[in-house]
A protein has these predicted regions:
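Active-site signature of alpha/beta-hydrolase-fold catalytic machinery across serine-
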Residues: 41
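Short juxta-domain linker segments that transition from a proline/glycine-rich
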Residues: 2-9, 16-20, 26, 30, ...
Length: 501
């Protein structure tokens, strides 16, 4: 058991005993001959007092010394102990959200038995859906990004400083974008990298990785030769980000086999952000977005042309949009990325960033079928190969059946380079409100397809005649209707015969 957990359990016991004894912090501090501020630190699990102080605290609280220092909790609180000692709790990035474990503890100790029952339920749900610690940490990262609206000025400034420092030597600035050759030469000359673009593709077990790094005095960067130039550019720019930002704790492969900490995920995200800002400079992207939003009619060619302008993939472009649009245009947005394997009827949400409270059923282990009318889903069956140029663009004005909320969505679908049997779609969506109408002139273009959508087929009330792409019967909707019918029948029975009093 870690020292921190011992502190936390001791602090929880002291606080509970003090409340049971009806003592204020000042009362107990005076009787135990310590300052109220020091007692506060003890109750929050930050400090552990000397034995003589514990003796005085035990006397003031009317508790045996051994009971107070024991790390055993009451049976009803055992789940609390298990949760507090879990690696997820120990490694959760509370500080990134302005919290400490003790702050959470303060909430728990107000109703410890109820909190223990709740945590037990959460643990059981996690077991039911086989949730891994990595998924909790990724959810924490997503929340952290959404909390900051995915805009980080320090990383924007770092990318600008880097361009000003190294751009003149390697032929790029905010108007001249960095080339693949410039980035690879920079990595070799400034950071002493060796770059290999043959080995990965020739090793069967490693062919699925886009890149792999072997750190050392002279780092080795392995890049899969099957990737396209725009993908390689991002790998190089991200690798520069790790070095320029001095990010030590990081993933060594493009898709990490294991996640050891939140800091690893955060550093990966910071390096990727830097890489995107380097390839797509803020000022230039904002000017292009301003011109695009000012178009009087929807022009898919202008949208897809930005892929060529910046030499990036759809995911890179739309993710860069998500970093700049909320901050500089005041528009809330979401990004969804789905995968679909040929021959399968399953669609998997593999990445999302949700800054406009979109109703996205995204739980791990979701046994429902996403609405087939979503643009994200519609782009997948006919997705072209990744080499298609230009990639076809999808656009849709979607209206939720249940809330009448509207979202303008646009994006791309294509097949994965390293897994051609997998189709991937990525879309960016904007909530239709006064801010969007004031910004996007082509919003009401009649050439933009419109459709009614829902969350999942299992929740949708549309009849087969109203929806021809339903993938599953409305089982959850019918179950809810049956429950409401039973509730109504029970109320009618009570009204007719009384409650029996």
């Amino acid at each position: 058991m870690s020292l921190d957990l011992i502190n936390i359990i001791f602090g929880m016991k002291v606080r509970q005993a003090r409340l049971e004894a009806g003592l204020t912090l000042t009362d107990l501090a005076r009787q135990a001959e310590m300052s109220p501020s020091y007692l506060t630190e003890i109750e929050k699990g930050r400090k552990y007092p000397r034995a003589d102080k514990i003796v005085k605290m035990a006397e003031a609280l009317g508790k045996p010394y051994d009971d107070l220092v024991s790390i055993r909790l009451a049976p009803s609180l055992r789940q609390l102990e298990t949760t507090l000692s879990s690696t997820t709790m120990q490694r959760f990035p509370f500080e990134e959200f302005g919290l400490e474990p003790a702050d959470v503890l303060g909430l728990i100790t107000r109703e410890p038995e109820r909190a223990s029952a709740l945590l037990h339920a959460v643990v059981e749900i996690a077991r039911r859906y086989d949730l891994r610690e990595e998924e909790f940490l990724r959810a924490a990262l997503r929340s952290y990004q959404e909390m900051h609206e995915n805009y980080f000025p320090d990383l924007e400034d770092a990318a600008l400083r880097f361009s000003a420092e190294f751009g003149p030597r390697y032929g790029f600035d905010e108007t001249m974008l960095p080339t693949l050759d410039a980035l690879s030469t920079l990595l070799r000359q400034e950071y002493d990298y060796t770059i290999d673009d043959r080995a990965l593709a020739n090793i069967e077990e490693l062919r699925a990785f886009r890149s792999l790094v072997l750190p050392g005095r002279r780092p080795q960067l392995f890049i899969n030769s099957r990737l396209y130039a725009r993908q390689v550019k991002f790998i190089l720019a991200r690798e520069i980000g790790y070095r320029y930002l001095s990010l030590k704790e990081r993933s060594l492969t493009s898709t990490p086999d294991r996640v050891d900490s939140f800091q690893q995920l955060l550093n990966d995200a910071r390096a990727a952000y830097f890489g995107g800002a380097l390839l797509m400079p803020r000022g230039r992207v904002l000017a292009d977005l301003q011109a695009f939003f000012a178009l009087p009619a929807w022009e898919p060619g202008r949208f897809s042309a930005m892929l060529t302008t910046y030499g990036v993939t759809p995911e890179m472009l739309l993710y860069r949009f998500s970093e700049l649009i909320p901050e500089f245009f005041g528009i809330k947005l979401h990004i969804l990325r789905f995968h679909h394997t040929a021959g399968s009827d399953e669609y998997h949400l593999v990445r999302h960033l949700n800054m406009n409270q979109l109703l996205v059923p995204s739980g791990i282990g979701l046994l429902e079928h996403h609405c087939r009318r979503w643009l994200s889903i519609r782009l997948l069956p006919d997705a072209p190969g990744a080499a298609a140029d230009p990639l076809p663009v999808g656009v849709q004005l979607s209206e939720f059946l249940s809330t009448q909320e509207q979202f303008l969505c646009m994006g791309f679908g294509r097949r994965m380079v390293l897994s051609p049997q997998v189709a991937s779609s990525v879309i960016i969506g904007f909530r239709v409100d006064a801010d969007l109408r004031a910004t996007v002139r082509f919003l009401d273009d009649p050439n933009i397809p419109r459709d009614i959508i829902h969350e999942t087929c299992e929740r949708c009330p549309l009849t087969p005649e109203q929806c021809t792409v339903r993938a599953a019967p409305p089982a959850l909707l019918e179950a809810r209707r049956e429950q409401m019918a039973r509730k109504l029948a029970l109320s009618q029975l009570q009204a007719r015969y009384g409650t029996g009093d």
